[in-house]
Amino acid sequence: METDCSPMELTNNTESEEDSDYRDFEEADVKDMRLEAEAVVNDVLFAVSNMFVSKTLPCAEDVAYINVETRERGRYCVELTDSGLRVVAYDFDQTDDSLQNPYHETVYSLLDTLSPAYREVFGNALLQRLEALKRDSQS
């Protein structure tokens, strides 16, 4: 992270320890939605045809956009905010203010409603992991 002060200025800082703790808490509380969006993509990419964070639509601390193509070839632009995830357009890198789709708390819930193939792939992956755990515990 870039700062506007030199290392010498940091050592001369006279703020109290309490103020410093409070500031650190506030900074840690701020989410970068682009990072959140990247984590979402990495989590479920295996179960969809294509998924990536939009480079066209603006990302900010409070919003990011994810393009999703399901295995059924449905294309969606998904908004990620503190409220959750929701479809904002039926194509990549678009938003349609007339859409009033509901928010989903998780990407799993969203994809479960959009893609029967996602449900199957995700379920199979879960089953394989459980079987692997069972084999590991028996050996």
From Swiss-Prot:
Keywords: Cytoplasm. Coiled coil: none annotated. The keyword DNA repair does not apply. SUPFAM superfamilies: Hypothetical protein c14orf129, hspc210. It is found in: Cytoplasm. One of its GO terms (molecular function) is kinase regulator activity. InterPro entries: GSKIP, GSKIP_dom, GSKIP_dom_sf. Residues 1-23 are annotated as: Disordered. One of its GO terms (cellular component) is cytoplasm. One of its GO terms (biological process) is regulation of Wnt signaling pathway. Belongs to the GSKIP family. This is GSK3-beta interaction protein. The gene is GSKIP.
